Each structure stands twice: as structure tokens, then as C-alpha cells.
């Protein structure tokens, strides 16, 4: 459990007058025990509502300072200092005064401000909905008092059952997954309402989380210029892949894992879940006014695995770019070849590579490969590493065989971080590591450097 220790300090003239403080009004200092105790208790209502936290414009450094400057509606100001150890709130004050309501108000407003996540800056019209209130209630829990002393009050943030639930990260994430996105690196929670506007970048550690193909199209392609291709192409079951012989009498449907479902059933499930027909979207559009052909793989659709339809769509895109003399971009996010299609999926590696050979060698056109996390298997072994320029996202997981497969096959430990983009960049595997927020501008400059220019003068 964590403890938040609060030492309240005053620095306002009015409070100094009312509390009888002898400390200088121009400096910070702890509240000293005074005989004017009733004056604080009787006037306690003026602190029942804290309007805002000062210095909200610098929220990135807000938590690192560990000191909160708080002002209420009557312009009475004071600061709160805390250090996190356990999930128990402890208010440590140096007097007999009844500061409990004041500090409780501060805690309440701070938690609300964290749930809002810069709502006062991003959207002044932001209002709480029922789901937000549920999360706030869950975080705050039932406030109860523990053992009291002359110098310290302990406020427990949750009861026993809530503590057990809070420690269960899986239950917490599942319960509120419609509101939060959990970072895979630091396990911090990102508020989903503003997660897309932050390009799926963790606000706690800066890690680049997975992004859907539709979001990437919106990020890279100029508005109103996207023209999809081959949207009606869907996968069949060419080898009639069925992992198990289903017995409707003996098999409990609840115990049926998604990996054991028939291939067609899994395809239908992912199509309904993602709204996509396959694990890649292909089409044409403009980047800063420059016409491009682009294919974007989607890891949410069967792990971005490359089957016969994925290979065919990418091959047709390359052939179209070859005929139209367009620059080509392929954004890779894949677990490799799709095992449910056997050798047909492996054939796509050679087919795509052959089309790229004609595009790059014979026609002398420009292909940019963008490797996102994860890029593994057959995609890494084929078109993922064939770009004229190869760009990787920060901290992307890029490999041919995964860490678990290598360790089980070779019975040796894979060094931590040896399959990260930064490590591989030092070994010369990529041309550049580009953050997501700079990617569009970098692509525009690369295209212009290689002789591809905007269609209009105001295309930049």
C-alpha cells in the first residue's frame, strides 16, 4: 500500500491574520500550534471547496515537484507537499487544528483534476459523465479514519475489499478499459478520451503504443485525399485449416480458446471487431500535397499476420505505384506469416519482393518502409527490410524470431533490449528512428529530396 504524506503550509495574509500566525507572509513555513484554534474551526467552511490547482499549464513537471499550490474561492492559498509510498493517505500536521476538511477538499480536487487530464486546457466545455464519476468513486473509495494522535490523522483511501481489487491490475484494467489505455512499458493509465489526440503516446513514459491502421491514415494522409483500394478482398480457408476436431457434445464452448476456433470463425470475429476486411489497408493519398501509394498493416487484425489476401493487396498496391510512378510507403506491424494458410502465406514473401524488385530496380522509384512495434517473422524477412529508406518508431520491437521462440529453440537467454529499435539502429539495421509526431514532416522532406513535389503551391 502507498502512503501520501501531507504537510500543510500557509502563506496568505488573510489566513495569517485569522489564524494568528507570527511567521512572515512572504515565505513558506509549517503551521505552528496556536491558541486561536476556534477561529479556524468556525471558519472552516471557507475551505470546503478548492477551485483549482495553480500552475496547471505546466502539468508535465507538476508531479515531479511534489508540492501543490492550492487556492480556494476566497483567494486563500497554501501548499501541500507529499511523497508516495503506500496506497494510504496520511495527513501529517503540526497542530491541534481541524485541517481535515481543508486537506480532504484538496485531495478530492486533485483526483478530479487527474481524471479530467488537462480538460481545462483542452476543452473548456468538458463535463464529467457517469463513467468518469464511477472511476472517481473507485479511486477515492470510502474515506475512513484510522488511529488518531495529537500530531497525525490517517485517512484510508479504500476499504479491505477495494484494496484487494485495486491490487489486482487485471481486474482493474478490464473493469475500466473503456476509459483507460494501459501502457505496456510503464503500466501507467492513459485516459482514452485524449489518447488519440496524443498519437497513442504514453503520457507517463513517452512510449509509442500500438496504433490502428485507420488512426495512422488519419495521422499521415492529408484530410480528404485518402482513396482506399481492394477493400472488398477477403480471405477464404484455402487449406481448410481446423486446429481441433470439434465435438459438440464433449466440448464446453466456454473452454474453447480463440486460438482453437476454426479459421473462418476467427476471420468473422476480427472483421466484426475491427471493421476491417483484412490485416492491411491499401490506397492512395497525399502527404503534404505529395501523391503517394501507401499500405498500412493493422496488428489488431489477427496480429497483423500476412496471409494470401494481405500479400495480394500489397502486391497490387506496388504494381499500381509502379504504373503511376508514385512513391511507396508500407507501414509494417505484423507477427509474420499466417499459419492458418500454410505455405500459401509464405509465398507472399516472394511475391511482394518480386514486385518490389521491378518497382525499385527497373523503374528506379522510391520505397519507404516504416517499422512499428511489433514487426517480426515473414514481414521482417521480406518487404519490411527492402525499403530504400527504413524508418523505425522509438522502442519498437523488431525481430525475425521472437524472444520466446529463440529461448525455447536454442535454450539460451536473449539479452534484454537486443530486439529493440534503438539497439538495432546502433548495429546499422535502420536509417532513422523517427518519433510519431515528426513522421509526416520527415516523409514530406524525403519525398521532395528524391524529386517528388506537391501538386499545388500550398501543398506544404
From Swiss-Prot:
One of its GO terms (biological process) is malonyl-CoA biosynthetic process. Residues 179-460 form the CoA carboxyltransferase N-terminal domain. One of its GO terms (molecular function) is acetyl-CoA carboxylase activity. It catalyses: N(6)-carboxybiotinyl-L-lysyl-[protein] + acetyl-CoA = N(6)-biotinyl-L-lysyl-[protein] + malonyl-CoA. Its cofactor is Zn(2+). It comes from the Eukaryota. Binds 1 zinc ion per subunit. InterPro entries: AcCoA_carboxyl_beta (IPR034733), Acetyl_CoA_COase_Trfase_b_su (IPR000438), ClpP/crotonase-like_dom_sf (IPR029045), COA_CT_N (IPR011762). Keywords: ATP-binding, Chloroplast, Fatty acid biosynthesis, Fatty acid metabolism, Lipid biosynthesis, Lipid metabolism, Metal-binding, Nucleotide-binding, Plastid, Transferase, Zinc, Zinc-finger. GO terms for cellular component: acetyl-CoA carboxylase complex; chloroplast stroma. It is found in: Plastid, Chloroplast stroma. Pfam families: Carboxyl_trans. Acetyl-CoA carboxylase is a heterohexamer composed of biotin carboxyl carrier protein, biotin carboxylase and 2 subunits each of ACCase subunit alpha and ACCase plastid-coded subunit beta (accD). Belongs to the AccD/PCCB family. Component of the acetyl coenzyme A carboxylase (ACC) complex. Biotin carboxylase (BC) catalyzes the carboxylation of biotin on its carrier protein (BCCP) and then the CO(2) group is transferred by the transcarboxylase to acetyl-CoA to form malonyl-CoA. This is Acetyl-coenzyme A carboxylase carboxyl transferase subunit beta, chloroplastic. It comes from Cicer arietinum.
Amino acid at each position: 500500500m502507498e502512503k501520501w504524506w501531507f504537510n500543510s503550509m500557509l502563506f496568505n495574509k488573510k489566513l495569517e491574520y485569522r489564524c494568528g500566525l507570527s511567521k512572515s507572509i512572504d515565505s513558506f513555513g509549517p503551521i505552528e500550534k496556536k491558541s486561536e484554534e476556534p477561529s479556524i474551526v468556525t471558519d472552516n467552511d471557507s475551505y470546503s471547496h478548492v477551485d483549482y490547482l495553480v500552475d496547471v499549464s505546466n502539468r508535465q513537471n507538476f508531479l515531479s515537484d511534489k508540492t501543490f499550490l492550492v487556492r480556494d474561492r476566497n483567494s486563500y492559498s497554501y501548499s501541500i507537499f507529499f511523497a508516495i509510498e503506500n496506497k494510504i493517505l496520511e495527513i501529517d500536521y503540526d497542530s491541534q487544528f481541524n485541517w481535515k476538511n481543508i486537506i480532504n477538499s484538496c485531495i478530492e480536487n486533485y483526483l478530479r483534476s487527474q481524471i479530467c487530464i488537462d480538460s481545462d486546457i483542452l476543452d473548456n466545455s468538458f463535463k464529467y459523465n457517469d463513467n468518469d464519476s464511477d472511476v472517481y468513486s473507485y479511486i477515492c473509495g470510502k474515506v475512513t479514519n484510522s488511529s488518531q494522535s495529537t500530531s497525525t490523522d490517517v485517512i484510508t483511501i479504500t476499504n479491505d475489499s477495494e484494496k484487494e481489487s485495486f491490487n489486482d491490475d487485471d481486474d482493474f484494467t478490464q473493469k475500466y478499459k473503456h476509459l483507460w489505455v494501459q501502457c505496456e512499458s510503464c503500466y501507467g493509465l492513459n485516459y482514452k478520451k485524449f489518447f488519440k489526440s496524443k498519437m497513442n503516446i504514453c503520457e507517463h513514459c513517452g512510449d509509442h503504443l500500438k496504433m490502428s491502421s485507420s488512426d495512422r491514415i488519419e495521422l499521415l494522409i492529408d484530410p480528404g485525399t485518402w482513396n482506399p483500394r481492394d477493400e472488398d478482398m477477403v480471405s477464404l480457408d484455402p487449406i481448410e485449416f481446423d486446429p481441433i476436431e470439434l465435438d459438440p457434445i464433449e466440448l464446453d464452448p466456454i473452454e474453447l480458446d480463440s486460438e482453437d476456433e476454426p479459421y473462418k470463425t476467427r476471420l468473422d470475429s476480427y472483421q466484426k471487431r475491427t471493421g476491417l476486411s483484412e490485416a492491411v489497408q491499401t490506397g492512395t493519398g497525399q502527404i503534404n500535397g505529395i501523391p503517394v501509394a501507401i499500405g498500412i498493416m493493422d496488428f489488431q487484425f489477427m496480429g497483423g499476420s500476412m496471409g494470401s489476401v494481405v500479400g495480394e493487396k500489397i502486391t497490387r498496391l506496388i504494381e499500381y505505384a509502379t504504373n503511376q510512378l508514385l512513391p511507396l510507403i508500407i507501414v509494417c506491424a505484423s507477427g509474420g506469416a499466417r499459419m492458418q494458410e500454410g505455405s500459401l502465406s509464405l509465398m507472399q514473401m516472394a511475391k511482394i519482393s518480386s514486385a518490389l524488385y521491378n518497382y525499385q530496380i527497373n523503374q528506379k522509384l522510391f520505397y519507404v518502409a516504416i517499422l512499428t512495434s511489433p514487426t517480426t517473422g515473414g514481414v521482417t524477412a521480406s518487404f519490411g527490410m527492402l525499403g530504400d529508406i527504413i524508418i523505425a518508431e522509438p522502442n519498437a520491437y523488431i525481430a525475425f524470431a521472437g524472444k520466446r521462440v529463440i529461448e525455447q529453440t536454442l535454450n539460451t537467454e536473449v539479452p534484454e533490449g537486443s530486439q529493440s529499435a534503438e539497439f538495432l539502429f546502433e548495429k546499422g539495421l535502420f536509417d532513422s528512428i523517427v518519433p510519431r509526431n515528426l513522421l509526416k514532416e520527415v516523409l514530406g522532406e524525403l519525398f521532395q529530396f528524391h524529386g517528388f513535389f506537391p501538386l499545388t503551391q500550398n501543398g506544404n
